[in-house]
Amino acid sequence: MEKKMKLFRICASITLVLLGFVLTNTPSRYFLFFNTPEPVEEVVKVAKKVDPKQLACLAKNIFYEAGGEPINGQAAVARVVLNRITHGFGSNPCNVVYQSTVVQKENDEGENQKVKLCQFSWVCEGKGEPNKNNPKYVQASQIAYDVLAYDAYNDVVPKSTLFFHNATVNPAWPYQQVKTIGNHTFYSNKKKQKKMNNDR
């Protein structure tokens, strides 16, 4: 019995020595039961408070200007409105969307008449409230909310992008073209560089 106890103690000692060696020379990742998970850094965007009136103005502009465009095209129109705020076109989306001016213009009879010019054509056309259940308006509203609440799609066009037009027309704008998305071509506020005349 005594011999068995001595043998047991020897075996136990050897086992502990070997276990200690393994634990001190083996990376801890192989012993999951000793590990504590490494903290994962998670970026959580907090939604900004959105004014329903401003949301409606931006959503209507997206809907009327780009309702049939791809999501990026609609988002680009929304970003143009926000870019204009930072460039002094207005202090909020509604100011920018409904910005207009009245000018004197000569009609076909040679008479001067007052003409209202709008930043966005649908405003001058007097279009009213869209059908809130229209799937395209629902999508436009979601894009508008994401842009206002989370600053979403902030890389779809540069922050200098302030203008756009339908790609089927070709106005003589002096601005640099940024990109075309769907049926809209977007421009920055930077003037086109004049071509150097190298003829001698």
Place the predicted regions along the sequence by residue.
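Hydrophobic membrane-insertion alpha-helices, especially the h-region
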Residues: 9-26
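Bacterial extracytoplasmic/cell-wall-associated proteins, especially those involved in peptidoglycan
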Residues: 22-200
